[in-house]
Amino acid sequence: IFTENGADEICIIVNRLHPQTEAHVRHLMAQPGHAPIRLAVETTPSSMHSFNVLAPWLEDAPFCLTTVDTIFREDDFAAYIRAFRQGQGGLMAVTDYIDDEKPLYVGTDADLRITGFHDSDEGDRYISGGIYALQPEAIATLRRCMAEGRSRMRNFQRALVEDGLELHAWPMSKVLDVDHASDIAKAEAFLSETPTPQP
């Protein structure tokens, strides 16, 4: 899906706990027909730390970041990437479908500019979809977070707002998080549904 949407390269981090995952990615790397893949193998204490491992590969151009447990429709993602290419700031995927153990609520204004990220519902319509399209200057915010001992991607997102980076929300029809084995069947059913046409 990243190749189909114009990725120059695909940067992946996997942990050392499941060697079969690394083996699978290395198998993909040997196959033709996709953007070049860079692989980091490192076990980290949080998602922000994993991002930090990838950061040296991302700091020279706009990039899209997501996690392995985020499930979304391919056509939603394609529209999201097209919108990001047309803008100047960061574009964060959001959804009004809430089926997450600990959702991160996203505050927005009337123009979908992001005003904050909240652990509880403060009257927000959307939650984070776990897909982040950002400009290279976001790496400076990441480095500040690491220097301050922060962890978790939700705290990185808050820091982007603190630093005054321009962020907009991009609503997707539905985004699922696969946190447990029981979520796999739910994700498969979601992906097999016929998409509802967007207005």
Task: Give a label for each model feature.
Residues 27-31, 56-58, 81-84, 107-112, ...:
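Short, hinge-like loop/turn segments at secondary-structure boundaries
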Residues 16, 66, 133-134, 179:
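A conserved hydrophobic position in a structured secondary element of the catalytic/binding core
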Residues 67-71:
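The conserved acidic donor/metal-binding loop of glycosyltransferases
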Residues 113-176, 182-198:
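Catalytic-core segments of class I nucleotidyltransferases/pyrophosphorylases
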Residues 44-49, 99-101, 175-178:
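A short acidic, often aromatic-flanked loop/helix-cap motif at beta-alpha or helix-coil junctions
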Residues 1-65, 148:
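Conserved N-terminal catalytic core of the sugar/cofactor nucleotidyltransferase
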Residues 73-147:
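Conserved core of the sugar-phosphate nucleotidyltransferase
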